[in-house]
Amino acid sequence: MVQRGSKVRILRPESYWFQDIGTVASIEQGGTIRYPVIVRFDKVNYAGVNTNNFAEYELVEVEAPKAKPKK
C-alpha cells in the first residue's frame, strides 16, 4: 500500500519515468479518479514537468515513508 512520502518505482511503460523512482506527493481519496496518486521526481521530462499522476497498480513501493519523531 503506497502512502504519502513513499518511494515508488513506475511500471507504466509509456511514461517518461518508466522504471525510475519517485516520491508520492499525495493520494486522492475519491473513488472515481482514474489516476489518484501524484508522484514527484528529481528529474524533469521534456516539458519541464517533475510530477505526474499514476494509478496504484502502476506503482511498486520501494521504501516506506520515514516515521516522524514524537515530540
Swiss-Prot record:
GO terms for biological process: photosynthesis. Its main location: membrane. InterPro entries: Elect_transpt_acc-like_dom_sf, PSI_PsaE. It holds the Pfam family PSI_PsaE. The keyword Thylakoid applies. The keyword Thylakoid applies. It comes from the Bacteria. It is a peripheral membrane protein. Keywords: Membrane, Photosynthesis, Photosystem I, Thylakoid. It is found in: Cellular thylakoid membrane. GO terms for cellular component: photosystem I reaction center; plasma membrane-derived thylakoid membrane. NCBIfam families: PRK02749.1 (NF002745). HAMAP family: PSI_PsaE. Belongs to the PsaE family. Stabilizes the interaction between PsaC and the PSI core, assists the docking of the ferredoxin to PSI and interacts with ferredoxin-NADP oxidoreductase. This is Photosystem I reaction center subunit IV. It comes from Mastigocladus laminosus (Fischerella sp.).
